[in-house]
């Protein structure tokens, strides 16, 4: 009886320890994630214009909605800049076009340009390398004038910008290979720079007047084969356009912010690529490297099947601002 009692006590202690570890791993972030203070604009306060010219630069902002930060188990520093990366300008496409899932060769070529030698390692470790194509609806804006560093130092500066809707497609397998790297967000950039990976609406909306911290406060949405996957108000963004431009300048101090440059402001929650926070923290504790993580992500056929595949129709839209739909092949 005493042995049985002791076993029961040990099992009880074990349950408590495991429970405590799980609670610790699944703890929330230390800082509350709050939306920025915006001057909300209605669409009748501006006009629509066509735009066809390719921008010289496309900048991407990451982790700019609380929902997306939480679903990807990402860290958040209220005093820090959001992730910033550059997309290839030839990734732009328009409504009704087709978007090709990148082949293994195209992905390895992109990786090799960023990190010479990595393609050999990937070939050795992975017989299969699915792209893990994912969608991201985003409010985008285009610069209507050159912006100087002096402008960005003015807290009351109201950049002259026009707004549009974009889908910021990404091959998540490449982004995972940036885990733990000093230039992690450059991997995000290459994962989002394939041909057709930036579908945009065909018009830009330009406010009649430019005020600090102003955006059109509208619902943005993603549908895949008619099913709503993302739906969020743009007023839930964590950063203002000025803060985003300041972050871009700090990341790329030698690049000029030029008229025609585009900024994609980040996506809300609802993407395919999501991971519980406790799993991410446990992976860090046991020392999983980027290749281990990619193996974990690509080994579960059910999880891989959730990503976009040939034949899918992906629509992103902004309430009154426009929409763009593409077909995956």
Question: Which role does the model predict for each range below?
Answer:
Residues 260-261, 312:
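Structural motif
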Residues 21-231, 239, 258:
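Active-site microenvironments in enzyme catalytic cores
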Residues 1-16:
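N-terminal Sec-pathway targeting helices
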Residues 244-253:
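A short, acidic, amphipathic alpha-helical segment used as a generic capping/interface helix at domain edges
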Residues 101-109, 195, 199, 235-236, ...:
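Charged, cofactor-coupling segments
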Residues 256-257, 308:
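Short, well-ordered loop/turn sites that connect or cap secondary structure elements
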């Amino acid at each position: 009886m005493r042995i049985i009692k002791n076993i029961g006590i040990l099992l009880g202690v074990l349950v408590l320890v495991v429970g405590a570890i799980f609670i610790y791993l699944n703890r929330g972030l230390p800082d509350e994630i709050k939306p920025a203070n915006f001057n909300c604009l209605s669409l009748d306060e501006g006009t629509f214009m066509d735009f066809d010219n390719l921008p010289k630069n496309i900048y991407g902002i990451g982790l700019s909605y609380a929902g997306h930060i939480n679903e990807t188990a990402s860290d958040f520093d209220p005093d820090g800049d959001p992730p910033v990366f550059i997309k290839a300008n030839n990734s732009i496409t328009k409504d009704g076009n087709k978007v090709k899932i990148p082949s293994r060769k195209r992905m390895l070529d992109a990786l090799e340009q960023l990190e010479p030698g990595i393609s050999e390692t990937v070939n050795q470790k992975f017989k299969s390398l699915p792209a893990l194509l994912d969608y991201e609806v985003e409010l985008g804006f285009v610069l209507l004038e050159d912006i100087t560093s002096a402008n960005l130092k003015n807290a009351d500066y109201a950049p002259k910008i026009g707004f549009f809707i974009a889908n910021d497609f990404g091959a998540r397998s490449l982004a995972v290979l940036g885990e733990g790297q000093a230039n992690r967000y450059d991997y995000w950039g290459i994962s989002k720079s394939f041909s057709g990976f930036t579908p945009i609406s065909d018009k830009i909306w330009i406010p009649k007047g430019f005020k600090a911290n102003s955006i059109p406060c509208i619902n943005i949405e993603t549908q895949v084969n008619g099913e709503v996957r993302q739906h969020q108000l743009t007023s839930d963004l964590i950063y203002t356009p000025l803060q985003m431009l300041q972050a871009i300048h700090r990341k790329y101090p030698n690049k000029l912010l030029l008229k025609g440059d585009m900024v994609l402001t980040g996506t809300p929650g609802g993407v395919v690529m999501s991971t519980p926070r406790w799993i991410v923290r446990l992976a860090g504790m046991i020392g999983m490297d980027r290749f281990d993580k990619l193996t974990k992500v690509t080994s579960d056929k059910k999880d891989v099947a959730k990503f976009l595949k040939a034949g899918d129709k992906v629509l992103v839209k902004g309430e009154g601002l426009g929409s763009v739909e593409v077909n995956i092949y």
